[in-house]
Amino acid sequence: MPVRTVHQYIDVYSPRKLDKRLIIGTIHPHVTENFNIPFFYGNIGSFWEILQGAFPQHDFTNLESILSILNKYETSITDIIKECDRENANITRDDLLYNLCLNTEQISDTLNESKIHTIYFTSRFGKNNAAKLFTSALKVNYRKYLDKNESEFIIPESQFGRQIRCIVLYSPSNEANKGIAGGAAAYLRKKEYYKQFKNPIKKFKIEFYREKFQYLNQQVD
């Protein structure tokens, strides 16, 4: 039976305009009551687990610690979808969501009024992925500035008053693993290396996130 998912965290944890970095995802699953953490990516085996593997000196296992880390490193998090429909409550794939209501106003206001210089997208350019919806809704010509080797593009100064670095992550979701194994150039270039690990794709994601979130290694008072 079709269900309407309304985002549980966007308005509770809105982006802080003094922060320097913004993480943008899509939307949580319809059912959130079973989340380990009542927050963005609070379900098992998600974004925070990848960051925990990449930065074991931090604690991404509980809400209080995650909020402390985000605050300490001047990082906000939000999602691009405020509401959407699904054919049933078990649907989690982004490409199967429909009747989307986007969080464009909050994100646009944040970028216009903040000091954010880096955006991280937790999914790429497939149907209803975070980077795809963001660039389409905010009319960002990412193709002109896309560096496929680095998985990054820039938003020029003319759009939000300053140049913004945009980093397109590989989705932390296990549903993305098949696509990574079959078509992610960064993974395929080192496929033989990753074969030695129990979970090659997870190891790849951990190393990719470690490279892109290098600032989490800095000592901050």
Where are these regions (language model features)?
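C-terminal capping/extension of enzyme domains
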Residues: M1-V12, L18, N43, N90-T104, ...
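Short amphipathic alpha-helices and their capping/turn segments at secondary-structure boundaries
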Residues: H7-R16, F60-N71, T110
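Short, hydrophobic/glycine-enriched beta-strand segments
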Residues: R16-I27, Y41
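A general structural motif
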Residues: K17-D19, E113-H117, Q163
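Short hydrophobic segments within beta-strands
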Residues: I23-G25, F121-T122, L169
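Short catalytic/ligand-binding loop motif for oxyanion handling, primarily in non-cytosolic enzymes
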Residues: H30-N34, D85-N88, G126-K132, N174-I180
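Short, surface-exposed acidic-centric catalytic microdomains
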Residues: V31-Y98
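Internal catalytic-core helix/loop-beta-alpha segment
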Residues: K72-N141
